Structure formats: structure tokens, C-alpha cells
Amino acid sequence: MKKIETSALIGLGALGILFGRKMPGVQVIADKARIARYSAEPVVCNGEECQFTYVAPEEGRPVDLLLVAVKATVLEQAIRDMAKFVGPDTVILSVLNGITSEEHIGAAYPGHTLWSVAIGMDATRTGRKLVFNQAGKIQFGERSGEMTARVQAVADYLDACGIANEPCSDILYKQWNKLMVNDGLNQAAAAFDQPYGGLRQPGEAQDMMRKAMQEVIQLANLEGVPLPPDNDVKFLDAMMPTFNPEGMPSMRQDVLAKRPTEVAEFAGVVRERAKKYGMPTPANDFFYTRIREIEAGYNK
């Protein structure tokens, strides 16, 4: 595996900005209308303007590393848009929420994808402005757990960029752990209209958040991924105090901006997979119904 030198990014939301701003020479894939919009109103991250190079899908050339940071709701379009940026040796990293994006990308570009997850950030995006305290890190690895040459090449590249990263031999465990977090935190913040600080207070939002997280732990165990029974408590005790109390996870940001949410990737996937085992998911049923109701009310 040769050294990674060229890179592209698709998706300039919170994660795309957080990581893309540190990738020298990264090409941001965007259609012409979006390029015009981005050029007219540049991204500002923690008060600093970010300078990106934009490239239309039809003008792409293969790159060494392609970072996919779109919302799950537009993944299929992104897969089409990045076609010309994928060459024989391109490595694809997807930092999408949920546990299914690598399967979708892998179906279109077999053999190119490393499994990955972005954790520990508390970024809040409003329009073209992003504010964060914690920049987070990318955990990644082969689905098989093997520490291959391309895993090392990606680690070397991210290190050189100054992006915190962790090559993993247990990436499926890490993905399910992140799903547990999103399933609780993201959905509770959206359904109960609460920032991080509100979720730290005892009450219905926190109760439902914990119940949803427990359902993910139970389902992960059924799927052969050994999340510990107290995994939710460990996360909440360790990480919640580090988050900006006024900040909020991405799903609440989507709801406030009246954007489609990723509820299908959280409660939707949990409910669907749980059916295989006859496992009830009352907390995720509640979140799925409530968030779909919120989305349905956007235009009323």
C-alpha cells in the first residue's frame, strides 16, 4: 500500500468540516449549485473561515483516500457522485452514523471500504457556522479485524493531518457502541427538544435515552457483539460531563432546521434487526414514532 497523498471529501456538514479543514488539499465533492452557495458563504469553524477546493462530480479524478461524511438520507446520491474519485487503490472511509453505510458503499465499490466511526465530538452547526469544544476522533479498521497495510496507511495520513485516530481490530464493537450512543442521545435530544445539558437532568428524556441504549446493548449481544450490560452508564458517566451543556447532537440540529433526520438508521435499524430475534423495542418504537411525527409537522 503506497503512502496516502491525495484526498477527497463528500459531505460538508459538521463532520465534514471538522475533519476536512485539517486535510491539506482535500477536494470537496459538490454539485455546481452547491459550489456556488459554498463559495458565496464560506464555512466558518470556531470563528475561523475555512478555505476548501470544490470539485463537481463529473470533473473528478481518482484519489488515495475518500472520506464520506454525508447524511444517511442522501448516501445513495453521494455514492453516485463520488464515482470518478474512486480508482483501483482508493480507500473509502465512511463516518456516517449507524451501522449500514459501509455495506451500501461496498456494494457499489467492492473492496475499497474500511469500517469506521467518528466519536467524541460535540460540534453544533448553524447554517455555514460550526462551533465545537471536542473535535473527536476517527476509529477505523478492516471488518475482519486484521491490521492491514491500508489500515496503517490511513493511520499515517490522519496522523500527518493532525486528526485524532485509532486503528482498531474490533471495529464492529466500536460501531455498535456508537449506535448505542446515537440511539439514546440523538433521539432523546430530538424527541424531547433538549440540549446535552437537559439530557443530564433526571426525567423522562433521560429515562427514555437510557432505555433505548439498553435495547441496543441487548440487540448487539444477540448479533454477537459483546457490548457490556453497563455500557450505557459507563459512557454517560465518562463523556456527558465533557460536552457543552448548550450544545446538541446532530438529530436535534436537523429537527430545528426542519431537515430529514437519520431516525431510520437508529430506531429504524434497531427495530428491524430486533424482529429477527423476537426482541421487543418499546423505547425505540417510541422514538421512531415521535420523530416521524415531528418530521411530518415540518410544513404545517
Where are these regions (language model features)?
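NAD(P)-dependent Rossmann-like dehydrogenase/reductase catalytic/cofactor-binding core
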Residues: 2, 210-300
